[in-house]
């Protein structure tokens, strides 16, 4: 019998716990939750194990602490949420100094015990944290990716669907750039079941949707008061992991290393990529007009500034 895949979730907070539940329900593979608070990881793992009977799914969920990364040994996928979440008043950039140390330690653990893993980074500020993961692990560019664009696009899909009175599932959308206030929702490449957005919504509504998408994470932070979004980020990362583990070759907007595409070199920026068994198998380059290129360049400049602060 074929051996089940193994998914390591590093960080057992709100996103980590939701990731574990979704991975279990989809039976993507056995799950190991790892956290600096070992009891939290083990407690959530046990809670999830006790869900299997009623949920009708059969993969194991175990927990462990960050004092012993050997529990992630030979993981096929590592999804990293370690670090602190945004708090009200904090920008993603404020998080950099706090979370860089955590990511560096995690990267060393992954490099030692899961050297062949496909690594998905969720920790913010995303584009600099995924860059740090790439530099510290030394993994090839196709095996390190950041979860940003899938989430940003999902938010855009919901806002469009809500405004147009249609299912978000029928909204085709694309968001480029960094995971921050300078992200670039591409209206020209977005539609509802093939119908251009401009046929369904006026410019004022579309402009408001673009702005709300850019501020989407902050909106939830303000409402929660004690943390940041976790359901949609977890679902977005699971879509990426599933495409890799099941070789689905989905086209997903992710933070990937660019080597000349879109005029960018040596940075992780949100672009459409194909994710399959080879990891990030290719970057799809869209034709941009002058306005879109200018917006993307502003986003890239923000990413460049954030990455420079890592000093890696």
UniProtKB/Swiss-Prot annotation:
Active site feature: 179
Which residues does the annotation say bind substrate? 86, 92, 124, 155
What would you give as a GO molecular function for this chain, any one?
L-malate dehydrogenase (NAD+) activity
Q: A single Pfam family, by name?
A: Ldh_1_N
Q: Where does NAD(+) bind?
A: 11-16, 35, 99, 122-124
Q: Alphabetically, which GO biological process terms does the record hold?
A: lactate metabolic process; tricarboxylic acid cycle
**Superkingdom of the organism of origin:** Bacteria
What InterPro entries does the entry give? Answer: L-lactate/malate_DH, Lactate/malate_DH_C, Lactate/malate_DH_N, Lactate_DH/Glyco_Ohase_4_C, Malate_DH_type3, NAD(P)-bd_dom_sf
Under catalytic activity, the entry for this protein gives: (S)-malate + NAD(+) = oxaloacetate + NADH + H(+)
User: EC no.?
Assistant: 1.1.1.37
Keywords recorded for this protein, A-Z: NAD, Oxidoreductase, Tricarboxylic acid cycle
HAMAP family linked: Malate_dehydrog_3
- What's the family? Belongs to the LDH/MDH superfamily. MDH type 3 family.
What functional role does this protein have? Catalyzes the reversible oxidation of malate to oxaloacetate.
Q: What protein is this chain from?
A: Malate dehydrogenase 1
Task: Give the species this sequence originates from.
Answer: Anaeromyxobacter dehalogenans (strain 2CP-C)
